[in-house]
Amino acid sequence: MKEGWIGDDYLVLFDEAEVAQVTARYQVATQLPGLNVIGLRGWDDLIVRDAVGSAHVVPSVPMDPQNMTPYVVPGHAALKQDSRFAGKIKWYLQPVVFGGDPNAGPNVAWVTHEQHGELVAWWNAKYRELKVNGGAA
């Protein structure tokens, strides 16, 4: 895994050997079958790759294919390391789609990569549940 800044975006780019494990952690097959997680952009978006190698970004919550946009993945060498954020991911305790405040403050916590995967999977399951039951999400 390599992480760092490129312009205004903080990126986490996973090594090829990590892709299957990370994809499973985020339970991407449930929401985006056939795609693999290859990175994170700005802590809020997953960078995914399709079977032909094209990359896209999609919000981590909700992980909806309608919200995917094409993305050109920069090379690892372009990333400017920043030890303040190494191994941490900014997480909204109540995701914005559920009415959480997007500004820094009491709604923001810093979590590990493993915790982030668990939180993304849990909140996406909650989103699907509400959507199926006609709730507002």
What are these regions (language model features)?
Residues 1-89, 94-137:
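Nuclease and nuclease-like effector domains acting on nucleic acids or nucleotide cofactors
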